[in-house]
Amino acid sequence: MQHLKDFSANASTRYSGLTDNMIEGKGYARGFELDLSFQQRNLHLRFNYTLSESKRKFKEINNGQAFNPPYDVKHNIVINSSLYFSSRFSLNLLWTFSSGVYTTFPVGVALAHNITDSENKPILIPVYTDRYNYKLPDNHRLDANLDYLFPYKRIRLKISAGAYNVYNHSNPSFVYFNPEENENGKTKFIPKSKVILPFIPYISLHLNW
């Protein structure tokens, strides 16, 4: 792929528009997908696997070395199963897995010159070198639900009960950095993560007529 766009390492929107900070590079994307399904009486199974790789290369970024962009997900797996105990009662399971994406971590910290915060404390600034230099942990979770159907004449009532992220795996939705001072008085930027979707049970009613 040619003529790919990205922001330069020294991009600034203070004195110029966004398009003035764009640089041009090249890259490639390739992948493979496998999709399998199985059905036998009351059991339905589906398996999907995607293997992909994406690289980008810009003369002005990472000293011209190729890098993985933040949307590069190497492995992606989806396993879906449905078990029908009867025409009214069923169990559904969905397990998903995706490789961690790349993000940019600081390599150090600098002290802002003659600038303090509201409490007159010095302001610390993270120092970055290479872009997309850290791979986040892999993401995976299991969702499950039970469905029960109550048909009555023209009315169909379905009750669903289940949970997202059954085993409560901590999948980081985003990462931020918090300055912390150790016993020696040195300050480091410690990476912290936020989890948006922990274990969440639910129950729902669906009425059709």
Regions found by a protein language model. Give the residues of each.
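C-terminal beta-signal and adjacent terminal beta-strands/loops
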Residues: M1, R88, F97-P122, P137-D143, ...
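Flexible, active-site-adjacent loop/turn segments at secondary-structure boundaries
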Residues: Q2-K5, M22, P69, Y134, ...
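Gram-negative outer-membrane beta-barrel transporters
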Residues: H3, S12-F105
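Context-gated lysine
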Residues: K5, K26, Q40-R41, K55-K59, ...
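Solvent-exposed loop segments that connect transmembrane elements
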Residues: D6-D20, K57-Q65, V109-Y128, Y176-I190
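Short sequence motifs at beta-strands and strand-loop junctions characteristic
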Residues: E24-A29, S37, P69-K74, Y132-R141, ...
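Generic recognition of flexible, low-complexity loop/linker segments
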Residues: E33, I79, N133, Y148, ...
